[in-house]
Amino acid sequence: MEHLIHYTWKHKIFPLQELRTTEGLLVEVINPGLANTHDGPDFIGASIKIDGTLWSGNVEIHIKSSDWFRHHHDRDSNYDNVILHVASIIDCPIYYPNGQEIPQLQLSVPQHVINNYDMLTRRDSLPRCKDVLSTLPTITIHNWMTTLTLERFALRTQQILARRDSLNKNWEDTLFITIARNFGFGINGNAFEQWAQSIPMGAVGKHRDSIFQIEAIFFGQAGLLEGTMHDTYSSNLQKEYLYLQQKFSLTPISRKTWKFLHLRPQNFPHIRIAQLASIYYQQKLTLSSLLNAHSIEAITHLLTTDVSEYWRTHYTFDGPPSASATRKLSPTSIDLIAINSVAPMLFAYGKYKSDQDLCDQAFDLWQNIKPEKNNITRNWASAGIICENAADSQAIIQQTRQYCQTRDCLRCAFGYEYIKCTPDLLREQEVRNE
């Protein structure tokens, strides 16, 4: 219950009647303060008028006023600047060190807030707050979506910088692994990252002028050159890998790491690895070229490459030949790589270099790419939140994974709009949405 008292105070969801202290003094909340995530009072920097006098300081919140003593705040100097103690149940007075009584406000959580929060936490279908989404002002949606987009970039930046730290702070290796992970397109993302991490890029760089040797290392490290090979190309590739494996002390990942079920042939790991080998061989996708890619067209140029001759007629080593065809990345695949790898890399590098222009470049890139189409974006579209670009779809993914799936409605702007709704307004919206 205390978290709902916090919420009620933070958002000033107060009863219609006047607020008064236990001594009958009129309370006017000018600013509830900022939630404190460190030791000390729950809210800091509050501004409150008590009996006409403006006070600035901190606010502490409990279920019972006696919790003040149970938590030993009476012996903690961090609480000496508390100007108001808020509790649902006032069962005792509390005092400053000098013996003066601390003003207390009895604040009950409105019943509709309790009911609405309970409904949100019990409802399974997403988005849980769909009944109010269609009524929200455009500015409310825009502001929250912008916040979610920045949160998404921050999360990706944290992941990329952690990856870089594990790679001796090498940005080129970080780029390769980040791009490689995205070539798994969800299903094989972890496998591609594990595979890319197994490849010593310094060693591969010594053979970058040979697509055959690059493919030998790439496929060998993927565990896909084990067993009997049935044609000249794959047999020679296996022999080359065994030589390079001994030369560089390479340890491949297990072939069982890869998933093939429900994949179309053009999405098989073999094809994706062949595409990566070709991109790496052509040396177009480097950190330098990435930093100069200011549009999706420029990124498309960096990622547009065909596979070597063998892979134009094969999907695996052991499968029958197919009709010759190009195996270039599709426009949709390039968009996804730009969304999930290129833009986050630009943003992370911009943060690392304190270069706001690079961060803006990443943000602009998302805003100029078509939105992703998946179950998450379709669910939100049916509730009235339409994604106009990739920044929007990434915001909705952030919303779903970091707020909806964790039921963290109290930190969510959409959740706030639902929770504060009175019963009459909520029923009205439910009827409209039926």
Language-model features: where?
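Sequence termini and other peripheral, non-core segments
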Residues: 2-23, 33-37, 208-209, 214, ...
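Compact, glycine/acidic-enriched structural inserts
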Residues: 80-82, 86-143
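Hydrophobic, aromatic-lined core segments that form the binding pocket/scaffold
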Residues: 148-395, 408
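Hydrophobic/aromatic-rich, well-ordered segments within soluble, folded domains that form packed cores
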Residues: 53-64, 83-87, 401-420
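Acidic, carboxylate-rich catalytic segments that either coordinate divalent cations
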Residues: 382-434
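N-terminal accessory interaction module
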Residues: 44, 54-55, 60, 66-98, ...
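N-terminal ordered "arm"
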Residues: 7-66, 79
